[in-house]
Amino acid sequence: MAQKSEKENIIGRIANLLAVGFLYSESPTLVDRFANALSKEAVTKVLYDVQRIVQMGIDRSEIATTTITIQGKDYPAQGKDYPAVNVNSSGAKYTVVGYLPTSQDIEDFLRMIEEDVYYARKAGALAMSIANRIKLGSKQSKSEQGGEKK
């Protein structure tokens, strides 16, 4: 089973998946269902649902992986390329920094929630934070650009 830091990395990638699903679908419902899940079955269903939504975005070329250069204090190496996921939804463009989970991550996460459903709550809270920060950054960019979409 995953060690502590590896568990945190898995939770982060699951949170990225949920955030991408939220931004693409423009609905926090999946994140809410995930964060409020009381059983592993409920978490598993939401994981399936969000992966289907993301798959639709990938198939439509509205979700794609990329790399971006970060200039800021939030990241250890300024000017370095970081993995990211671009999301285009209803004319809005968002970028989630980090990776989406692998199939092994999903398998490990499902084992983790068998031990404690708290991991799903943690991933849900993190996903909402990621999405809110990205949406807020997008709105600030629009106001700086005279209200145009990013």
Swiss-Prot record:
The Gene Ontology biological process terms listed for this entry are:
defense response to virus
InterPro entries reported for this sequence: CRISPR-assoc_Cas5
Q: Can the keyword Kinase be found in this entry's annotation?
A: no
Cysteine disulfide partners in this protein: none
Another remark in the UniProt entry says: The aCascade complex was purified from strain P1.
Assembly mode? Probably oligomeric upon overexpression; does not interact with a Cas5 (Sso1441)/Cas7 (Sso1442)/crRNA complex. Forms dimer and tetramer-sized oligomers when overexpressed in the absence of CRISPR loci A-D; the oligomers are probably responsible for its toxicity in the absence of CRISPR loci A-D. Part of the aCascade ribonucleoprotein complex, minimally composed of Cas7 (formerly Csa2) and Cas5a, which binds crRNA. Other possible components of aCascade in strain P1 are Cas6b (SSO1437) and Csa5 (SSO1443), while SSO1399, Cas5b (SSO1400) and SSO1401 have sometimes been seen weakly associated.
Instruction: Quote the function comment for this protein.
Output: CRISPR (clustered regularly interspaced short palindromic repeat) is an adaptive immune system that provides protection against mobile genetic elements (viruses, transposable elements and conjugative plasmids). CRISPR clusters contain spacers, sequences complementary to antecedent mobile elements, and target invading nucleic acids. CRISPR clusters are transcribed and processed into CRISPR RNA (crRNA). In strain P2 toxic when expressed in vivo in the absence of CRISPR loci A-D (strain P2 contains 6 CRISPR loci in all). It causes strong growth inhibition, a significant proportion of cells have degraded or no DNA by 20-24 post-induction.
Protein name, as recorded: CRISPR type I-A cluster 2/Apern-associated protein Csa5-2
Q: Which gene encodes it?
A: csa5
